[in-house]
Amino acid sequence: LADGGTNISSESTTDYIAGYTICNDWSARDLQREEMAMNLGPAKGKDFATSFGPYMVTPDELETAWGDDGKLHLRMTCHVNDILISDGNTNDLYHPFEKMIERASMNTKLLPGDYLGSGTVGTGCILELRPENTNGWIKKGDIVRLEVERLGVLENKIV
């Protein structure tokens, strides 16, 4: 975020966006499964793995990527060990960025420099794609490469 605030209305959120980058939150589905069994929804955060990068692109650099539908249209692919397992687009995100910022700031102070994750781009989750269709869960030694059009490539090795 470029600026901070509380209870930011969706109509003014564009002034708060410093830029866009790729984020892999390395969801811990085992922890999430335990929470879902309690009917609480996935609420438990983790502080051991999130990857960002390789750089941040400012909003003016993406002006032509916005569609008439008000959504950002950027292709996203995911490869594991050079095998394509996912091909999606940011226009498949359920909530628009403006609503995400509005919700995140509801009764909460957001600060300049905070990062907000948009959630998974359609087809971007091994759980939803089914592990049997993606060569299984990621494991030690695997190389995961996320590429988002105009945002670059984020590649990480599982250690």
Show the residue positions of the predicted features:
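Structured core elements
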Residues: 21, 75-79, 109, 117, ...
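Acidic/histidine-enriched ion/cofactor-binding microenvironments in catalytic or ligand-binding pockets
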Residues: 10-11, 67-68, 102-115, 130-147
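Charged, cofactor-coupling segments
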Residues: 35, 42-50, 54-57, 91, ...
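Glycine-enriched loop-and-adjacent helix/strand subsegments that border the catalytic/binding cleft
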Residues: 1-101, 107
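Thr-Gly-centered strand-to-loop micro-motif
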Residues: 87-88, 111, 118
